[in-house]
Amino acid sequence: MIRPRFRHTGRPCCLILLCLLLLPWLGACAPQYGVSVDSLRGPQADSAGTVYVPRPGVEGMAEDDLLFRDVAAQLEPCFTARGYTLKLDEQTQDKSDNLVFISFGISEPDVRIYTTVSYVPYTWGRGHFRHTRWVREEETRTKVFFHAGLLLEGCTRAPDGGRGKNLWRTEIRCTGQDDDFRTLLQAMLPVLQQHLGKDTGGRRYFVVTLDEDEAPVVEEKEVTAN
């Protein structure tokens, strides 16, 4: 079974922003994840039908790869929520069905060092001889992040059964402190469910909170990338 690696495509500031979004919540009880999504939709998508057959987009990955099949199954509710049908292995396929190519992976550990500077008053002496001096103190923290990527490309089926015309393209990224892709995928699904196959008008950023006892909490964040 292939373990796909996430390749850092596009501007690296996107990954830095996802890390910075997480810093205020790293001490929270429930796990927090930084998620971004960028989706495009072509004019032919509205008339192309709503049935899709999943195909692996990772080079060298077979359709019977266990991880690919597991990821496709977890994506099915997102397709259903958007009014699409995702045909899995046991369902009969038709030549008129569209295709969706699924690419995904996880990065190597991303070690980041953050330094916090503060000034602490240091006082000595008494009465008129009392003096105060502000002393600079630095606190250094090391955090290890993992970046996961998921790319879904919807297209028509060509006469030879391969990739036809592009219909839509949805790319989603997730940053967290878990080193397992399937764990990071759980944080991506609530955002994907709202934006799959849509036109987002650019990249949008979210903080997702996952709690075993409650539904995921998704909060959109306004960020500025220089």
Give the role of each language-model region.
Residues R7, R82-G83, E137:
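Short alpha-helical segments and helix-capping/turn motifs at coil-helix boundaries
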